[in-house]
């Protein structure tokens, strides 16, 4: 898919991620100058393809409609193959599939076609409540959302998501978001963005100074590298910096960390910090610098905090 684009700073996406529940805090978000919200949408049916809508889907759809009615543009994020949850009392993680068995065996054309049709349905069902931008799945390069599925299944499911969305709206602008810029992430992204893809942008999440070492200025190199590699506008699907939290003195023993649980979530401390530490003042300065970078970078589509 060839993309020709040019964008003024005032036209770029200024968004925020509400991955779970907005709690109706629309006025507070508007005070930030936010125009876009990223909201999750789940698989629609609980019994069969084009069957009975699940309660979870109905609730997610209503939240997107309510958010749009409040004057926001919504970027829907489609479901990954699944996700891990953590039971702290048991000290164990549990994997939850997001596509029911009736969608088909993963890796088969039946599965991919049902994914396409599911996404087409979602796109048409949301209608004008969904903005032109879509995020296909979430951070498919890390086990939290991919478990041990093969790379080709992850990549082809993401491609099928975009193809289905564009069946519902040929003008839709789709992309994925890798969890960070590293060798493993771009290896999988290369499969997603191979010839014949239906994507408009390349997306990436980075939390320099919190989840990764560095500071806001490290975004410049990531934006440059991803644009050079994929020749598509780059969206910062997630970014930010924590205003609180202690710094861990050492990494935990990998053997003790449950599968699918990030080390940060296990120890409940950060392994990185920007100069000045995790404070509201450092956070505010970090955001000022980050927003300036996204506004000025010629290949950046915008960002979601």
List each model region and its residues.
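Active-site cleft segment of glycoside hydrolase catalytic domains centered on the general acid/base Glu
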Residues: 23, 47-50, 57-58, 87-199, ...
């Amino acid at each position: 898919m060839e993309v020709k684009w040019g964008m003024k700073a005032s036209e770029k996406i200024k968004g925020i991620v509400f991955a779970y529940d907005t709690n109706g805090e629309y006025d507070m978000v508007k005070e930030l100058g936010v125009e876009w919200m990223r909201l999750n949408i789940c698989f629609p049916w609980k019994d069969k393809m084009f069957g009975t809508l699940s309660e979870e889907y109905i609730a997610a759809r209503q939240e997107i409609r309510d958010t749009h009615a409040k004057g926001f543009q919504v970027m829907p994020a489609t479901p990954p193959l699944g996700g891990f949850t953590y039971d702290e009392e048991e000290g164990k993680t549990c994997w939850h599939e997001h596509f029911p068995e009736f969608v088909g065996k993963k890796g088969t054309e039946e599965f991919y076609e049902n994914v396409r049709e599911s996404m087409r349905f979602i796109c048409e069902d949301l209608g004008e409540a969904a903005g032109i931008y879509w995020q296909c799945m979430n951070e498919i390069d890390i086990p939290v959302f991919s478990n041990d599925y093969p790379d080709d299944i992850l990549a082809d499911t993401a491609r099928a998501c975009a193809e289905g969305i564009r069946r519902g709206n040929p003008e839709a602008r789709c992309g994925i978001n890798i969890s960070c810029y590293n060798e493993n992430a771009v290896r999988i992204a290369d499969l997603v963005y191979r010839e014949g893809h239906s994507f408009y942008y390349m997306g990436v999440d980075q939390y320099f100074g919190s989840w990764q070492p560095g500071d806001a200025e490290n975004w410049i190199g990531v934006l440059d590298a991803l644009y050079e590699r994929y020749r598509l506008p780059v969206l910062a699907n997630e970014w930010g910096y924590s205003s609180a939290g202690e710094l861990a003195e050492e990494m935990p023993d990998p053997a003790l960390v449950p599968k699918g649980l990030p080390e940060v979530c296990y120890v409940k401390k950060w392994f990185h910090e920007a100069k000045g530490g995790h404070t509201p003042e450092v956070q505010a300065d970090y955001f000022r610098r980050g927003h300036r970078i996204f506004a000025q970078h010629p290949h950046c589509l915008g960002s979601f905090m």
